């Protein structure tokens, strides 16, 4: 009798514990009715603010599309580049729609979707800095946004150039980089092509120009969430797939970046 009662008790505990064990981030988001997206808002045309201070851009629309697919309301959480992963880990956001490069080092901490966008890179410099190519950055003070793919690559190249007249400085935001560049604190930076041409056309930075291509690999960027949230990662993968095959990816590209064909997200010889 005692064993029968014990078995029944264990069975009840198992039954009542299963829903809790199976609950995950995807369930939590749907239950809460809100999707909190980390978005970088000083990175046009991916993310910025309009004249009325409303968040706008490719990443903002992507977050809104994801929330719509989930049947919840989107909440844009402005997040500087260095804070994207900390915002996830601390629970301030549910996902990052923040142009995050899918590096193996970051994958130790967060989970990545398949790529939802891909970037090439250009130099941005001041018109009077004497820089007209990536190679001509050698011997100049340069800078980039801390924690980004281009910052890691640019700092590495400055170290390899070993020119005592040169140097690298990290900044907390893209806006800080362009302010320092326009004021003469640095002479150049490397940024995504989308940002480079948007900045050169910005009347607030009339003394800046595009200074040629940066010889970096294509930067594939992904949506991010906590690495253990397999259900959420699977959903994000299917969401990106749907964005492409329904034509929404191309539509957003032409709205914010184009006109033309958006970057190919297929990686030769890989499974996506």
Which residues fall in each region the model found?
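Sec/Tat signal peptide C-region and signal peptidase I cleavage site
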Residues: 17-23
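Extracytoplasmic small-molecule ligand-binding "clamshell" domains
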Residues: 23-99
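Beta->alpha turn/N-cap motifs
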Residues: 38-43, 77-82, 91-103, 119, ...
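Periplasmic-binding protein-like
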Residues: 41, 117-125, 201-238, 259-272
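Ligand-binding cleft/hinge of the Venus flytrap
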Residues: 63-72, 150-170, 200-205
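Short helices/loops that flank or line small-molecule/ion binding pockets
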Residues: 68-69, 77-78, 82-96, 109-111, ...
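A ligand-binding cleft/hinge motif common to bilobed small-molecule-binding domains
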Residues: 83, 100-108, 153-157, 182, ...
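Flexible hinge/capping segments at coil-to-helix
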Residues: 125-142
């Amino acid at each position: 009798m005692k064993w029968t009662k014990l078995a029944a008790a264990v069975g009840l505990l198992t039954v009542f514990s299963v829903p809790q064990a199976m609950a995950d981030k995807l369930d939590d988001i749907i239950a809460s009715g809100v999707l909190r997206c980390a978005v970088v808002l000083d990175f046009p045309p991916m993310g910025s603010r309009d004249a009325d201070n409303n968040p706008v851009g490719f990443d903002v629309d992507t977050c809104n599309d994801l929330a719509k697919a989930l049947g919840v309301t989107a909440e844009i959480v402005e997040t500087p580049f260095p804070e994207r992963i900390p915002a996830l880990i601390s629970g301030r956001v549910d996902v990052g729609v923040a142009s995050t490069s899918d590096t193996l080092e970051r994958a130790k901490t967060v989970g990545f979707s398949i790529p939802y966008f891909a970037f090439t890179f250009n130099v941005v410099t001041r018109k009077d800095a004497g820089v007209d190519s990536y190679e001509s950055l050698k011997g100049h003070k340069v800078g980039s946004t801390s924690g980004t793919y281009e910052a890691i690559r640019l700092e590495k190249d400055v170290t390899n150039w070993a020119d005592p007249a040169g140097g690298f400085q990290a900044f907390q935001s893209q806006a800080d980089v362009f302010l320092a560049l326009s004021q003469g604190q640095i002479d150049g930076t490397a940024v995504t092509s989308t940002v480079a041409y948007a900045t050169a056309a910005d009347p607030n930075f009339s003394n800046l120009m595009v200074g040629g291509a940066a010889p970096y690999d294509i930067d594939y960027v992904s949506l991010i969430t906590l690495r253990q949230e397999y259900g959420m990662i699977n959903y994000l993968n299917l969401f990106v797939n749907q964005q492409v095959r329904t034509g929404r990816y191309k539509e957003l590209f032409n709205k914010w970046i184009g006109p033309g064909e958006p970057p190919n997200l297929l990686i030769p010889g890989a499974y996506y």
